[in-house]
Amino acid sequence: MEILFVSDYVCPYCLVAKEALRRALGKLGVDAHITDQPYELTPEPKERVDTYHDQRRRANYQILEEPCRQLELDMKLPPKIIPRPYTQLAFEGWYYACDHGRGEEYNDSVYRAYFIREQDIGEITVLAALAEQVGLDPGDFTKALEEGRYTEKERQAVQYAREVLKPQGVPTIYADGKKLSLNDYTEAEMLQALNDASFSGPGHFCGPDGC
């Protein structure tokens, strides 16, 4: 099974969905390849948002409490990082990690740094420390980001997501080309969605202008 996972590091639904997806695939025993597709909710120079003091967002995030409990994710909903960071550099770091065989580990580390440990993933120093934790050279990693080694690649990827895939929001998940819509992000729901790729519902996600 080929899975395309469109996401952003500051989207709480994305972390929960990725963990539910992994567990569901494990239970199904499906041979699946997951391709991550970057999508920036707040691309520069758009003004960053304060999710921490936004009561509407807090209320929306409550749907994640039960799946977080089931998946053993101690997430801060939302994390106390004000304003919410841009994610361009984090994605550039991901491309570096992919080139050095640590893409998946880096992805997991960035999500957890933001939503569990409340670290500012918009800062190169934070990203470099995460890179080192997954076995990458923090010095070369920092140099790559400062030199913009992956800036154009990241820009093209986000442009592709916006102009070709055109997701309503993130996460957007395609299984063998068919879009999955999720309501509550539980493992059970993900199992149902994967078993029937036509499964859909109203869905909850982070849109371009809100999350």
List the predicted regions and their residue ranges.
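Structural alpha/beta surface segment adjacent to cysteine/selenocysteine redox centers
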Residues: 15-114
